[in-house]
């Protein structure tokens, strides 16, 4: 090797080392973001009766067979964006920082709705259509940054003519590349304002001697009704176990249920088929029938249009 060649090799090595140093410095100071734990978690409304979920995971494995793939659920009711939003809020906080979550409930697939990756202040990355799915996670974990997916580079090869399966061709592909370290968060696409499309709902708040809140979800296996009222807010009413809670449930402005329910630690403290108010595993106020289905019995569902008011009846 000539002296000139040695000099060129040395210069190239210095440039590579310099680029590596710059990359590490930017990474250390949070100027670029890499999802490092190789975990991708999926949720969809696809169900498991066909091969759609398998296709999404196959795309991820093709990006990197080292990825670890998990599921939240694929049984979100069809087109139910609100339920997708709730399941994210329910579960994401239990996954380690750096996890990539791919959420696909996308009735507007192929239209002008944006495809984004939201980085939460907790360090999670949510890949999703910006259609309301991010409503609750943006509030609970906070928005660090939002980037629009640049499909000119972050789309599965030769998939441009397919306009109805972005879950496979865009979201799973981009999420896998991010989780595998093939791309940084900055390489997802252009930075957007730190806002997302939000579904309106009643946030939990104290209003005089009442607390107003929302019914974001049902404990669907058992028909328990979950609210977004945290135990700490409920405690401001100074409830006592065994005493009654006055509950009024609305669908839009229509009153669906009114009743006084005993506040209990757990289900077995009341007789079978009797109602109770309790704090659920997410530390939020909930309502149930012991060994029964509260939601079905009283025709209650969940979503942004469902609200609740609670108070403590005055003792005589």
Which functions belong to the PLM regions below?
Residues 1-16:
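N-terminal secretory signal peptides that target proteins for export/translocation
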Residues 18-27:
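Sec-dependent N-terminal signal peptides
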Residues 33-35:
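Boundary at the C-terminal end of the N-terminal hydrophobic targeting segment
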Residues 159-241:
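Anionic-ligand-binding alpha/beta catalytic cores of soluble enzymes and soluble regulatory domains
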């Amino acid at each position: 090797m000539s002296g000139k060649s040695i000099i060129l090799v040395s210069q190239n090595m210095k440039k590579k080392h310099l680029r590596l140093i710059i990359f590490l410095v930017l990474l250390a100071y949070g100027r670029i973001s890499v999802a490092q734990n190789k975990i991708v978690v999926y949720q969809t409304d696809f169900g498991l009766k066909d091969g759609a979920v398998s296709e999404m995971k196959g795309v991820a494995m093709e990006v990197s067979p080292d990825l670890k793939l998990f599921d939240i659920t694929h049984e979100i009711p069809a087109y139910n964006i609100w339920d997708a939003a709730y399941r994210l809020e329910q579960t994401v906080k239990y996954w380690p920082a750096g996890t990539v979550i791919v959420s696909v409930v996308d009735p507007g697939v192929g239209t002008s709705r944006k495809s984004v990756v939201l980085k939460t202040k907790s360090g999670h990355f949510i890949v999703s259509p910006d259609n309301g799915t991010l409503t609750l996670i943006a509030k609970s974990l906070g928005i660090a940054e939002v980037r629009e997916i640049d499909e000119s580079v972050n789309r599965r090869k030769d998939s441009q003519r397919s306009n109805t399966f972005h879950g496979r061709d865009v979201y799973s592909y981009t999420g896998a590349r991010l989780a595998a370290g093939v791309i940084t968060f900055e390489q997802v696409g252009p930075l957007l304002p730190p806002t997302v499309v939000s579904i309106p709902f009643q946030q939990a708040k104290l209003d005089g001697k009442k607390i107003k809140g929302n019914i974001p979800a049902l404990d669907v296996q058992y028909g328990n009704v979950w609210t977004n009222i945290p135990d700490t807010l409920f405690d401001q009413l100074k409830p006592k176990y065994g005493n009654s809670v006055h509950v009024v449930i609305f669908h839009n402005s229509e009153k669906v249920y009114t009743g006084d329910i005993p506040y209990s630690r757990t289900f077995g403290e009341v007789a079978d088929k009797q109602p109770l108010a309790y704090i659920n595993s997410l530390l939020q106020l909930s309502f149930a029938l012991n060994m029964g289905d509260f939601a079905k019995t009283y025709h209650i569902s969940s979503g942004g249009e469902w609200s609740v008011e609670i108070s403590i009846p005055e003792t005589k």
